[in-house]
């Protein structure tokens, strides 16, 4: 649908608070029988601890002058959520917590998303544990989700050896990982195993050899 108008605003309110806002209005398309729609996103972020932050987000799609003969999927689709990003003061640990709830006049499109990860990365060691949950009735008409009704669990870890010789290669080492996919009843659907060997060069280029098994 053709965009009629839009506005975008973002910036720091002070040293701890940041806000972001975007709004787009589309024009009605009589040929395709689409109503005009308003798309809006608002985020409010608060700095916590030394390097971490917590954010609230609201995403809205609202049909304008919708009637029963038009082809729009619903009168509105909204998502509200919270996100917490953690970074340790020594820059070794990082993590995330994310929760989203979809709101819709259609009962089968009112679901949830919960995702999280925790990771550790030093000059030699790195590992990460990640999970994702998307319910079967979650809906995000503004944005994209790969699929519904799944749980993903992933673990990766690696180690780097540093060269002492005056050669282009800076470091090299193995990385292993395993990923599991389940439906929301926790019936296993798929799994992937991986083994990579990384080569990092002093000019910041990287070469990776890898094996994947499903």
Regions found by a protein language model. Give the residues of each.
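Low-complexity, polar/charged sequence tracts that form flexible coils or short amphipathic helices
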Residues: 34-36, 74-76, 109
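Surface-exposed extracellular loop regions of Gram-negative outer-membrane beta-barrel proteins
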Residues: 18-20, 39-104, 166, 171-175
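Active-site cores of enzymes that catalyze phosphoryl transfer or operate on phosphate-rich substrates
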Residues: 1-65, 129, 151-153, 203
